[in-house]
């Protein structure tokens, strides 16, 4: 097995036993990036010099006996995380030349463990999308089929794992942006409970929905990464002051008696036959392990997409007002005065999808429509939260598809925003409820594309979904399959 194919825990063991150095592992990974990046386009920025410098420092740390789980591990980050001294664009022209003066809290926590940063990953512009087609830096391709999308908005984070261009990655999830690409690329992706991981230093899209999480090769790595970034942060007012459990200790091959809910609103006519077949097989696997299934109802599911696209766009129109060409970012060189500079800088700097969402959000917040749209959406959000609360009185975990179809072809839904928005129909409710959910590899379509299953837990119930995911992984081999690039 090549060094770039290892998991975090496998590479950690080799580093600990001095069988390999971090510099060797990092060089192998950088060579892999060079080899496949022209076909995948998972990265916006690759940082070879910084990576090798970090790897040398990690090797010194290991030699001194000061080793943590991520010391010397090559990791890549979605280009939405501020990284001190490393360009951070959010895949937008408006931030093309932006170099942050500080690190996001999650980045600082990974650096404190001694991670090796190999680069910043492609995404949908400002995390607005489900296909990683809206990036200013070009489309990312799915390593399983280069003519298909990798999912979005954290498409680069999932594609880099599937293409073996990073040992682990970090993404963000606002309406499914970690789980959906993880499903489409055959990776493990986890969206923690809102408030579990600090959002400080993460470029904001929709502040009440955004959450930071890992994309990895297996569930063990996912637990390691979550443990590294989770925890209270006084710099983030939405961060929750709760102790961080040792997620690795939750990993158990025992789900006997675990009550798993199947929401009838998610298993509907119109679900792709390959997705349905994968879900049926996964349910049988869990039954064989002694889990119990209960049919449940999440009655307000039908309203989730409309609710999300009112709340998220409203928050985006406010959050993105700061990009005006004055203090940082793109400034139009053809402006005639201040107001013209605002208009031209934003018109030139933002892509079509970002402009669409800013306009939708501004409309929803306008005085004549605020009550009819934004306020009503917040009320429906509360009903969706209550649906999940009631469900978790009956069950421990909820099992659903991640997406209605496997990865679709690049360009297939670009001209139809509504079709694109509906591809997140099964992931959006989890963000609106503020609870945790994850995608794990569960099978393949007849065309050889990965299909994931979603496990949803109660708020701060990451240990429970990790346990359920680990048990499934131990009894299947989907996570071991590799894209042949």
From Swiss-Prot:
SUPFAM superfamilies: Amidase signature (AS) enzymes. InterPro entries: Amidase (IPR000120), Amidase_CS (IPR020556), Amidase_dom (IPR023631), AS_sf (IPR036928), GatA (IPR004412). GO terms for biological process: translation. Keywords: ATP-binding, Ligase, Nucleotide-binding, Protein biosynthesis. Belongs to the amidase family. GatA subfamily. It comes from the Bacteria. This is Glutamyl-tRNA(Gln) amidotransferase subunit A. Gene3D superfamilies: Amidase signature (AS) domain. It comes from Geotalea uraniireducens (strain Rf4) (Geobacter uraniireducens). It holds the Pfam family Amidase. GO terms for molecular function: ATP binding; glutaminyl-tRNA synthase (glutamine-hydrolyzing) activity. Its EC number is 6.3.5.7. Heterotrimer of A, B and C subunits. It catalyses: L-glutamyl-tRNA(Gln) + L-glutamine + ATP + H2O = L-glutaminyl-tRNA(Gln) + L-glutamate + ADP + phosphate + H(+). HAMAP family: GatA (MF_00120). One of its GO terms (cellular component) is glutamyl-tRNA(Gln) amidotransferase complex. Allows the formation of correctly charged Gln-tRNA(Gln) through the transamidation of misacylated Glu-tRNA(Gln) in organisms which lack glutaminyl-tRNA synthetase. The reaction takes place in the presence of glutamine and ATP through an activated gamma-phospho-Glu-tRNA(Gln).
């Amino acid at each position: 097995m090549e060094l770039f194919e290892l998991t975090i825990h496998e590479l950690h063991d080799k580093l600990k036993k001095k069988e390999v150095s971090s510099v060797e592992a990092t060089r192998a990974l950088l060579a892999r990036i060079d080899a496949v990046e022209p076909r995948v386009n998972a990265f916006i920025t690759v940082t070879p010099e910084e990576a090798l410098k970090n790897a040398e420092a990690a090797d010194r740390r290991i030699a001194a006996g000061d080793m943590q789980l991520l010391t010397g591990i090559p990791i890549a980050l979605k280009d939405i995380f501020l990284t001190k001294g490393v360009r951070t664009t959010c895949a937008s022209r408006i931030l093309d030349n932006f170099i942050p003066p500080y690190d996001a809290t999650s980045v600082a926590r990974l650096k404190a463990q001694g991670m090796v940063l190999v680069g910043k990953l492609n995404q949908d512009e400002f995390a607005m999308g489900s296909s990683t087609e809206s990036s200013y830096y070009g489309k990312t391709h799915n390593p399983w089929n280069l003519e298909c999308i990798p999912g979005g908005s954290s498409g680069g984070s999932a594609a880099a794992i599937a293409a073996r261009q990073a040992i682990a990655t970090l993404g963000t999830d606002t309406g499914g942006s970690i789980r959906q690409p993880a499903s489409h690329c055959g990776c493990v992706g986890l969206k923690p409970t809102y408030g579990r991981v600090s959002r400080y230093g993460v470029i904001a899209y929709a502040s009440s929905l955004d959450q930071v999480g890992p994309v990895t090769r297996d569930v063990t790595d996912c637990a390691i990464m979550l443990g590294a970034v989770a925890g209270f942060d006084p710099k983030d007012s939405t961060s929750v002051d709760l102790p961080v459990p040792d997620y690795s200790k939750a990993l158990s091959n025992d789900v006997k008696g675990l009550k798993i809910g199947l929401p009838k609103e998610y298993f509907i006519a119109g679900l792709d036959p390959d997705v349905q077949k994968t879900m049926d097989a996964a349910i049988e696997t869990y039954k064989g392990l002694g889990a119990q299934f209960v049919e449940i109802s999440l009655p307000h599911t039908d309203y989730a997409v409309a609710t999300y696209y009112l709340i998220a766009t409203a928050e985006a129109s406010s959050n993105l007002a700061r990009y005006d060409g004055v203090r940082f970012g793109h400034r139009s060189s053809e402006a005639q005065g201040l107001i013209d500079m605002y208009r031209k800088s934003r018109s030139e700097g933002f892509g079509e999808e970002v402009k669409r969402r800013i306009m939708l959000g501004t409309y929803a917040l306008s005085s004549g429509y605020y009550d009819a749209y934004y306020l009503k959406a917040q009320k429906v959000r509360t009903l969706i939260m209550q649906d999940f609360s009631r469900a978790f009185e009956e069950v421990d975990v909820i099992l659903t598809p991640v997406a209605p179809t496997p990865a679709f072809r690049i360009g297939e839904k670009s001209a139809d925003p509504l079709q694109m928005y509906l591809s997140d129909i099964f992931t959006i409710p989890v963000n609106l409820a503020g609870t945790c959910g994850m995608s794990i590899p569960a099978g393949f379509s007849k065309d050889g594309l990965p299909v994931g299953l979603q496990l949803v837990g109660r708020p701060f119930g990451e240990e429970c979904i990790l346990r359920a995911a680990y048990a499934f992984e131990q009894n299947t081999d989907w996570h071991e399959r590799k894209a042949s690039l």
